[in-house]
A protein has these predicted regions:
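Macrodomain-like recognition of ADP-ribose-binding/processing modules
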Residues: 1-170
């Protein structure tokens, strides 16, 4: 696998809640400390450029090595946070996450990517709607960029998500 996608937080340093089951924590744990070090270095460079309070914007991906993971790269992206209700702006931000990750794959000559369910955990994006947006966005991108990718995987954690993706992809 050329890249796996990490649903990151805006600090881009991984989850700091011990034993937390979010994908961000799992990726940083299994990749090894080198991943957190690379993320920290990249964020230091961005803070030097944009100011000490810089946080990674929603839908803007960042690529790193994957270290101990069975992939070449990790593409970290901050998904939208649903605070009160789902809006069309939040839906567009989620679609932008998928589009921007695929564009980053294209720019870096990566031909396979595994997406996690972006924003459906603690960021509270409704799971079914997130799956619909993910599949629709990826399918449209693949039509617009034929032969750009050899393999796109939707990797799910919950049975609920598996059911949604299976229904949508039929």
């Amino acid at each position: 696998m050329d890249a796996i996608v990490n649903a990151a937080n805006s600090q881009m340093l991984g989850c700091f809640i011990p034993m937390h089951m979010c994908i961000d924590n799992q990726i940083h744990t299994y990749a090894g400390v080198q991943l957190r070090e690379e993320c920290s270095h990249k964020m230091e460079e961005l803070r030097a450029k944009y100011g000490s309070y810089y946080e990674q914007p929603t839908s803007v991906p960042m690529i790193t090595a994957a270290y101990n993971l069975p992939a070449k790269n990790v593409i970290h992206v901050v998904g939208p946070i649903v605070r009160n209700r789902l809006t069309s702006e939040l839906e567009q931000e989620l679609a932008d996450c998928y589009t921007n990750v695929l564009n980053m794959c294209l720019e870096n000559n990566l031909r396979s990517v595994a997406f996690c369910c972006i924003s459906t955990g603690v960021f509270r994006f409704p799971n079914k709607r997130a799956a619909e947006i993910a599949v629709d966005t990826v399918q449209k991108w693949l039509v617009e960029n034929p032969n750009a990718m050899e393999r796109v995987i939707f990797n799910v954690f919950k049975e609920e998500d598996k059911k949604y993706y299976e229904e949508i992809l039929q």
